[in-house]
């Protein structure tokens, strides 16, 4: 059983919704993730999504685009993300770590090499938002060979037959997009979320994790009524971005604690 599967099994038995913060590698400073992740794990984070900066992040809204631009300006590349995963394990982070990046840099690095190096560093899976299931077989094989889960997105607009194709390839969990459009914090979750998640649930036994728009404890509780977990991304990056100099770790910790209600 993978570390991701073990985490969801434990949380399900405990009756707790998985909380998965998103951190951008190299944001706001080059090694900030090495400070943030251990502190957020102690504050209640159960898994981590670790962003790999990219110059054209199509699925991301303005907040994460700014974070990506700053990380690139800090000199961050894919290799540094792999080093960051290894550094987090050396610092004692036990939660699953799932790097999220766009396909082109991964392909240029080499999919087999990427899966090997990520696994050796201590990563647990990959999220690739622009990799369709029809083109994922090489990446899927590389991940499977090295014990990594490959996580796919499903959206409210995803047809049932495509969900079936995704479910046949996916492992770890299914990333369920809680709205149409790009990432970004929202005041309220989409009213059609329960029906959407039920439609996905009928087609897979994998845990469902809700992302896009999660920004409050109420959102986490609502997502937890219908899904196994919630990803908080733009709202957390906003907190880090708006923190006074030198206070971003403390502000992020307070925010993650608040999400637990």
Swiss-Prot record:
InterPro entries: Aldolase_TIM, RibuloseP-bd_barrel, Trp_synthase_suA. GO terms for molecular function: tryptophan synthase activity. Gene3D superfamilies: Aldolase class I. The keyword Cell inner membrane does not apply. GO terms for cellular component: cytosol. It catalyses: (1S,2R)-1-C-(indol-3-yl)glycerol 3-phosphate + L-serine = D-glyceraldehyde 3-phosphate + L-tryptophan + H2O. The active site is at residues 49, 60. It is an enzyme of class 4 (lyase). Pathway: Amino-acid biosynthesis; L-tryptophan biosynthesis; L-tryptophan from chorismate: step 5/5. Belongs to the TrpA family. This is Tryptophan synthase alpha chain. The gene is trpA.
């Amino acid at each position: 059983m993978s570390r991701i599967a073990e985490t969801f099994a434990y949380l399900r038995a405990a009756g707790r919704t998985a909380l998965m913060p998103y951190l951008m590698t190299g944001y706001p400073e080059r090694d900030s993730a090495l400070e943030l992740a251990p502190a957020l794990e102690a504050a209640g984070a159960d898994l981590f999504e670790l962003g790999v900066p990219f110059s054209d992040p199509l699925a991301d809204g303005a907040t994460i685009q700014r974070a990506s631009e700053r990380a690139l300006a800090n000199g961050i590349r894919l290799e540094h993300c792999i080093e960051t995963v290894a550094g987090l394990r050396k610092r004692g982070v036990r939660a699953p770590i799932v790097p999220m990046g766009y396909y082109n840099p991964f392909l240029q690095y080499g999919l087999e090499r990427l899966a090997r190096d990520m696994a050796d560093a201590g990563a647990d899976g990959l999220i690739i938002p622009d990799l369709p299931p029809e083109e994922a077989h090489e990446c899927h094989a590389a991940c499977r060979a090295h014990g990594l889960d490959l996580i796919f997105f499903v959206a409210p607009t995803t047809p049932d037959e495509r969900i079936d194709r995704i479910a046949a390839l996916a492992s770890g969990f299914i990333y369920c997009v809680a709205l149409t459009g790009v990432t970004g914090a929202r005041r309220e979750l989409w009213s059609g979320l329960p029906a959407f998640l039920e439609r996905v649930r009928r087609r897979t036994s994998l845990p469902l994790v809700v992302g896009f728009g999660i920004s409050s404890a109420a959102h986490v509780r609502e997502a937890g009524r219908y899904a196994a977990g919630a990803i908080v991304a733009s709202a957390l990056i906003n907190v880090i971005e708006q923190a006074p100099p030198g206070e971003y770790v403390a502000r992020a910790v307070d925010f993650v604690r608040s999400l637990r209600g």
